[in-house]
C-alpha cells in the first residue's frame, strides 16, 4: 500500500495531537499494536515540531543579527532535516 502524503500542519496542531497521543498511551488501555502505532506517530510529530522550532530559532537569529547592514533575505528552511 503506498504511503500517504501528509499535508503540513501547524506547530500548534502537531503539539495538540502529540498531547492526545501521550494521554492515550498513558491510559494503558491500548492493545500493543495500537500503542506502537501511536508511539511511532508521536515520534514523527515530535521530530516535525523540533524541526519547526529550529527553523523559527534560525529566523529569529537572522532578524536579530548584530550587523545592521546585513541584507535581509528570505528564510528558506532545509527540508532534509527530517
Curated annotation (Swiss-Prot):
Known function: Bidirectionally degrades single-stranded DNA into large acid-insoluble oligonucleotides, which are then degraded further into small acid-soluble oligonucleotides.
Alphabetical keyword list: Cytoplasm, Exonuclease, Hydrolase, Nuclease
Enzyme class per UniProt: hydrolase
Xref: InterPro entries: Exonuc_VII_S, Exonuc_VII_ssu_sf
SUPFAM superfamilies reported for this sequence: XseB-like
Transmembrane segments: none
Family affiliation: Belongs to the XseB family.
Assembly and interaction partners: Heterooligomer composed of large and small subunits.
Location(s), subcellular: Cytoplasm
Biological source species: Pectobacterium carotovorum subsp. carotovorum (strain PC1)
Catalytic activity: Exonucleolytic cleavage in either 5'- to 3'- or 3'- to 5'-direction to yield nucleoside 5'-phosphates
Protein's UniProt keywords contain Cytoplasm: yes
The protein's name in its UniProt record: Exodeoxyribonuclease 7 small subunit
Gene: xseB
GO function term, MF aspect, one: exodeoxyribonuclease VII activity
UniProt GO cellular component terms: cytosol; exodeoxyribonuclease VII complex
Gene Ontology biological process terms, A to Z: DNA catabolic process
HAMAP family: Exonuc_7_S
Primary location group: cytoplasm
Pfam families: Exonuc_VII_S
EC number: 3.1.11.6
Amino acid at each position: 500500500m503506498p504511503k500517504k502524503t501528509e499535508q503540513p500542519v501547524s506547530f500548534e496542531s502537531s503539539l495538540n495531537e502529540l498531547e492526545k497521543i501521550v494521554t492515550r498511551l498513558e491510559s494503558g488501555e491500548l492493545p500493543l499494536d495500537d500503542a506502537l502505532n501511536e508511539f511511532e506517530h508521536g515520534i514523527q510529530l515530535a521530530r516535525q515540531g523540533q524541526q519547526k522550532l529550529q527553523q523559527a530559532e534560525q529566523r529569529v537569529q537572522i532578524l536579530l543579527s548584530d550587523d545592521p547592514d546585513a541584507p535581509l533575505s528570505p528564510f528558506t528552511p532545509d527540508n532534509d532535516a527530517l
